[in-house]
């Protein structure tokens, strides 16, 4: 029996023997009403001091003109709102309101039909929902996100929305830490990035924040890290200007490029493929930045000299364009300025993602691991068209392998 069948068989046997039965235990949680405002969602309950009654005139509308006289709710000081006559009974209205979690449980749906006056939602909500990507703190896992699913299914049952889930993908971002602790005014360990922005620029600070850690992990703030990001931006600035001063090259037939040029173009397109995947699917911005850094290091510096061949200059230009387009979502001011220097009549924001050549994603070389008695002893690199017999011969004649075969 598999697990489910065994579970059913045990339940059936226990019931037949009258020694047990199946019961569902729900892990229900109290609704935390803690972030209240007087203008929060009103609770439609009336009381005569001994018994509670439902308000019959719905919706309950809060007054727009109130006076704040202290820390208590201003609604308690408004007799015209507080006191209600319902079927001859003098009742007192509930002045507590639901907290912010109540509205945030369905705000994403209301945004899609914000100007609908006849209903909570209209057909536009079904067009936009579910939310493709939802980003929020992990502290919402058992509160806001739970309530949102509850609300969405209530709205589904009411015929307001279609589907079962409000969010398709969820990313819980980490915290920014200072000295290993969560930033807090009471601890005095807060950081104001404005000073760093004024010194290094917004692009530098943004680059550091996205490069320092994966989005789902906590980030330890470091001024030294900001300086490192600034050095990289300066390097890109110098690289592009060196390329511009060397002069741009005419097109050439990539099918006639030599081995080094083809390897460099392969590196460019593999990086484009990885960065696109990191941005759109994995949301791994730190690895995307690392890949661009690696590409910028791999371009031979002599290709940026005016003495370099037209083919080298053209591949260098392809690399520079790709680097700027990949960095543009993170460092838009830098990339726009450098793009204008390359192409004064163009704006980088109007450019599409470069077309990735699938043929350049396939390696011409393969790495083959060689094991002896189940243990890795060496590794060889071969052309992908190499025949099996040649691979075996290369492995058997490998110095590290010969040593182990002789034992």
Annotate the PLM regions:
Residues 1, 92-98, 134-137, 177-203, ...:
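Conserved phosphate-binding loops in nucleotide/dinucleotide-binding enzymes
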Residues 1-55, 66, 187, 192-225, ...:
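Residue patterns forming the tRNA-binding/recognition surfaces of aminoacyl-tRNA synthetases
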Residues 1-38, 116-117, 368-407:
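NTP/phosphate- and nucleic-acid-binding module
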Residues 13-17, 123-139, 190-194, 212-223, ...:
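Glycine- and acidic
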Residues 31, 61-98, 102, 111, ...:
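Flexible, glycine/threonine-enriched loop-and-boundary segments that flank and lead into catalytic domains
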Residues 31-40, 231-239, 261-277, 281-302:
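Core structural elements
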Residues 45-56, 60, 170, 176-177, ...:
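Acidic, turn-prone loop/beta-hairpin segments
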Residues 96-134:
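Active-site-adjacent "gating/activation" loops or surface patches in catalytic cores
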